[in-house]
A protein has these predicted regions:
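A short beta-strand-loop structural module common to alpha/beta enzyme folds
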Residues: 1-10
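Alpha-helical cap/lid subdomain in secreted, periplasmic
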Residues: 13-142
């Protein structure tokens, strides 16, 4: 298992770093949990979709199965933007054949004890919930 995440990273940053990581590690499975920071910065859902799709395709071309962990934004970003953002993850999964967890924080988001003070990042208490969300989609890829 290689954790190549960088705190605060966007899909553009992940895409820029992906090729050398694929070359170095030759993963069998790639889990992409990117996009939240794109959304929190108000970046274009169109660009998010393009970047995420490119990351999935590059990973698949390198021989990896891909799991996308979808995200959602707080409602203060407006209905139109949050809807467009949330639609990116299932669209990319459908277009690329990647596996999908629609919302990785399902059951934890909005629960104060399961989220850090920023309301964005999960706590240690939330990890069993995240496992329940991710494992059914991840297990078939292993």
């Amino acid at each position: 298992v290689v954790n190549a995440s960088i705190s605060g990273d966007t899909t553009a940053g992940g895409l820029a770093r992906l090729d050398p990581l694929l070359d170095e590690h030759a993963p069998e499975v790639v889990i992409l949990e990117l996009g939240g920071n794109d959304g929190l910065r108000g970046q274009s859902p169109v660009q998010l979709k393009q970047n995420l799709a490119r990351m999935v395709r590059k990973s698949q071309e390198a021989g990896a199965k891909v799991l996308i962990l979808g995200m959602r934004l707080p409602p203060n970003y407006g209905q139109r933007y949050t809807t467009a953002f949330a639609e990116v993850f299932p669209k990319v999964a459908q277009e690329t054949g990647a596996a999908l967890v629609p919302f990785v924080l399902e059951g934890a988001a909005g629960v104060p004890s399961m989220m850090q003070g920023d309301g964005v990042h999960p706590t240690a208490e939330a990890q069993p919930v995240l496992l329940e969300n991710v494992w059914p989609a991840l297990k078939p890829l292993l």
